[in-house]
Each structure stands twice: as structure tokens, then as C-alpha cells.
UniProtKB/Swiss-Prot annotation:
Residue stretches spanning the membrane: 4-24
Claim: Glycoprotein is one of the keywords in the record: no
Taxonomy, superkingdom: Eukaryota
Lineage summary: Eukaryota, Viridiplantae, Streptophyta, Embryophyta, Tracheophyta
Membrane association type: Single-pass membrane protein
Pathway connected to this protein: Steroid biosynthesis; sterol biosynthesis
Name of the protein in its database record: 24-methylenesterol C-methyltransferase 3
Single Gene Ontology BP annotation: sterol biosynthetic process
Gene, per the UniProt record: SMT3
The species this protein was found in: Arabidopsis thaliana (Mouse-ear cress)
Length: 359
């Protein structure tokens, strides 16, 4: 009986480990398994050191707004978090309003399709995805619009992941991905029939620089839409709790200082855009975008147990636990930012590049 009990116990443990890692582990689109977690383009033995360097650099986000090293550390950030994002969140690295009766996956797709509907592109036209990540939005937008989408991301590992997903989805004929800095894009002037950026330009040290580049590569008369991360009119810089929440979001998301909602249209006009529409998509009647974060707390704890185990046995690189812990804390700051109304990740601005350059 002792032998039978031992085998049964071993079987139950093996089954539990398999369930944790292989059943609960994959992200909603099954792009990653927990056992595949890595440091992106960073070798496993350097993940811990790179995390420490990242965390030290972003301790005081407001003091690094003009730092030349920001793009390099944004690249480091996405090497550290891309696998965890895919595994625990999905292939679309952004938020969306909760839609009653719809799954998180469907709500995400609706949010993405709205972006391309706003810029009114036709099948076959060329559009830019500025800050494309692993291409979740790109694939949804290409499938919906039949436009030719070119995405740019600063992270080479994300380029590899995006191309893999594009091919698996049968959308590689519509989706192209290049590695580059959206502050200095490798595209000619007047290349694209439209452009969008979904929660990505927040990584730019200066919004004017990335908006100028997007303006440059767009054709005259074309439209650009962006979902911006901003502090709202409710934010008070003299409120210590407000400051703590915003700094927590900045540190945990590689942001060189969040911008005020009031700065977005001003910057767009400064680089030459005509502002067609501006709206905070997080405001009522939209349902709370942070519900998914709150409802996923059990999953976060489960995932953290998985990460600790995998790190302990050498499957996941050292430092992965630190990265996951950082993201868990950041999720709490994001939730507090949403609940208090001082932060929005979806301040939408729709702009047009004039047919003729202003005199």
C-alpha cells in the first residue's frame, strides 16, 4: 500500500505541475507556455543584471525625460517582459474598455478595429503601426481592413515573435514588421496612407519627436490615430497618493514621465497635424478597462507560483521572478489609477496631415 500511495502521490504532483504549466500557463491566444519563458534577446545568465540596471534607471522617471538612453532601456524592458506578457495577457499589449457580454479577447479586437475604422483606409492601402509589439493589433487590423500593415518595434525579439504569429495566422502577406526606433524610422517621406499607435508613444521621451516622424512618413491628407497614456484632469501633482500611483505606473512600464491629457493635441498641432477628434475612451459610458486586472489577481498569484518554481529548477532565467513581481505591483498601480480616474491608457486623438504644407 505504501508503494501504491507513493506512486499515486507522485502522479498527482506530476499532474498538478502539468496543469499549472501547460493548461493554465498559455496566454489566451496560446502564444506562449510558462516553460518557454525567457529574457527575449538577453541571454539567460544576464537577465538578472539587466533587470537591476533597468530598475535603477527608471527609479525617478520624471528626471530622465531627455535621457538618450531611454530607447535602449525600453528595448531592455521588452526583452524582459515580452514572454510574460504573451503568457499571462495575450498578444495585444494594451488595454480596452470592458464590453458586457463580450470576452476580453473580443473587447480587445473591437478596440483595435475601431482604430483602423477611424483612419478610413481601403483594402490594399499601406498603413503604419508605430510601436507594434508582437503584432496582436496588427493582425486584427489587417484581417478587418485588408490593408497592408507595416509595424515597427525597437525590440528585435518582438520582431521575431510578430513574424512567427503573422505566419501562423496566415496574415504574413498583409503584415510586415521591421526593427527600428520610431523616433527615427527607416521609411521615406509620404509613404503611408494612414497610421495608428496603440498605447506605444508613451515610451517616447518627447511626444513631439515621435509625432514628427509619423507626420513625415504619412501621405498628405491621410489620418493618424493614437491611444495615449495620460494623466487626466483629476490628477493633482500636490497629492502624494496621486504621485505615488503615477510614478508606480511609470517605473513598471518603462515610461520617461507620463504626459497630461492637455498636452496631446497641443503637440499634434505643433508638428503640423490638424486635430479631427479627441476623446478619452476610458470615460463613461465606457465600462472600466481595469476590471480585467482586478479579476485576474488569482491568475497573477498562480502565475507567480509557476515562475518561482521554474526559476528555482533552472527552467526560467534568474531574474524572472523579479520581473514578474514588478509587473504584479504595476498592475496594482494601474488599477488604482483607473479607479481614482487620474490615469487613462486610451486617450484617443485623431489627426490629419494637411493636403498642403502650412506656409
Amino acid at each position: 500500500m505504501d508503494s501504491v500511495a507513493l506512486y499515486c502521490t507522485a502522479g498527482l504532483i506530476a499532474g498538478a505541475v502539468y496543469w499549472f504549466i501547460c493548461v493554465l500557463g498559455p496566454a489566451e491566444r496560446k502564444g506562449k507556455r510558462a516553460s518557454d519563458l525567457s529574457g527575449g534577446s538577453i541571454s539567460a545568465e544576464k537577465v538578472k543584471d539587466n533587470y537591476n540596471q533597468y530598475w535603477s534607471f527608471f527609479r525617478k522617471p520624471k528626471e530622465i525625460e531627455s535621457a538618450e538612453k531611454v530607447p535602449d532601456f525600453v528595448d531592455t524592458f521588452y526583452n524582459l517582459v515580452t514572454d510574460i506578457y504573451e503568457w499571462g495577457w495575450g498578444q495585444s499589449f494594451h488595454f480596452s474598455p470592458h464590453v458586457p457580454g463580450k470576452s476580453d479577447k473580443d473587447a480587445t479586437r473591437i478596440h483595435e478595429e475601431m482604430a483602423v475604422d477611424l483612419i478610413k483606409v481601403k483594402p490594399g492601402q499601406k498603413i503604419l503601426d508605430a510601436g507594434c509589439g508582437v503584432g496582436g493589433p496588427m493582425r486584427a487590423i489587417a484581417a478587418h481592413s485588408k490593408a497592408q500593415v507595416t509595424g515597427i518595434t525597437i525590440n528585435e525579439y518582438q520582431v521575431q515573435r510578430a513574424k512567427l504569429h503573422n505566419k501562423k495566422a496566415g496574415l504574413d502577406s498583409l503584415c510586415n514588421v521591421v526593427c527600428g526606433n520610431f523616433l527615427k524610422m527607416p521609411f521615406d517621406e509620404n509613404t503611408f496612407d494612414g497610421a495608428y499607435s496603440i498605447e506605444a508613444t508613451c515610451h517616447a521621451p518627447k511626444l513631439e519627436e515621435v509625432y514628427s516622424e509619423i507626420f513625415r512618413v504619412m501621405k498628405p491628407g491621410s489620418l493618424f490615430v493614437s491611444y495615449e497614456w495620460v494623466t487626466t484632469e483629476k490628477y493633482r501633482d500636490d497629492d502624494e497618493e496621486h504621485k505615488d500611483v503615477i510614478q508606480g505606473i511609470e517605473r513598471g512600464d518603462a515610461l520617461p514621465g507620463l504626459r497630461s491629457y492637455a498636452d496631446i493635441a497641443v503637440t499634434a498641432k505643433k508638428v503640423g497635424f490638424e486635430v479631427v477628434k479627441e476623446k478619452d475612451l476610458a470615460k463613461p459610458p465606457s465600462k472600466p478597462w481595469w476590471n480585467r486586472l482586478k479579476m485576474g489577481r488569482i491568475a497573477y498569484w498562480r502565475n507567480h507560483v509557476v515562475v518561482v518554481i521554474l526559476s528555482a529548477i533552472g527552467v526560467a532565467p534568474k531574474g524572472t521572478v523579479d520581473v514578474h513581481k514588478m509587473l504584479f505591483k504595476t498592475a496594482d498601480y494601474l488599477t488604482r489609477g483607473g479607479e481614482t480616474g487620474i490615469f487613462s491608457p486610451m486617450h484617443m486623438i485623431l489627426c490629419r496631415k494637411p493636403e498642403k504644407a502650412s506656409e
